[in-house]
């Protein structure tokens, strides 16, 4: 199972028109953060006296999506109407949700993510450069 799911999905759809996923992917929910927002979070923390106390901060978005929904979203952006999704294997240790609580960074550093998943995928796929 790939460590980096978005590049795996894009490459599989472009090369084969299908994606192989674990059975868990039918239910698993994830949130994805764009690098722009990661960098903005670091800058917000460095610029906040209140945040410079040695604390650990979760940096994430509240936007949840299942892996299957992610495949469908990426496929639609690639012009693939009905992507073939093949399910095989199961990872028992794979949590159903990987969603972080970001209340502390939002309050102390006044940080909010600004890049939505769909927009980040457009950037990744080069759509914004064409428009």
Report each predicted region and the residues it spans.
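Flexible, glycine-rich beta-alpha linker
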Residues: 1-6, 29
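C-terminal substrate-binding subdomain of Rossmann-fold SDR/epimerase-dehydratase oxidoreductases
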Residues: 13-131
């Amino acid at each position: 199972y790939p460590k980096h799911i978005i590049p795996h999905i894009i490459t599989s759809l472009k090369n084969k028109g299908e994606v192989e996923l674990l059975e868990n992917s039918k239910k698993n929910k994830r949130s994805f953060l764009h690098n722009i927002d990661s960098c903005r979070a670091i800058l917000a923390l460095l610029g906040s006296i209140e945040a410079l106390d040695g604390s650990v901060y979760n940096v994430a978005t509240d936007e949840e999506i299942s892996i299957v929904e992610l495949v469908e979203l990426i496929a639609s952006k690639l012009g693939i109407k009905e992507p073939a999704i093949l399910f095989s294997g199961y990872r028992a240790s794979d949590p159903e949700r990987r969603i972080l609580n970001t209340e502390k960074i939002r309050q102390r550093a006044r940080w909010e993510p600004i890049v939505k998943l769909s927009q980040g995928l457009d950037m990744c796929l080069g759509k914004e450069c064409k428009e």
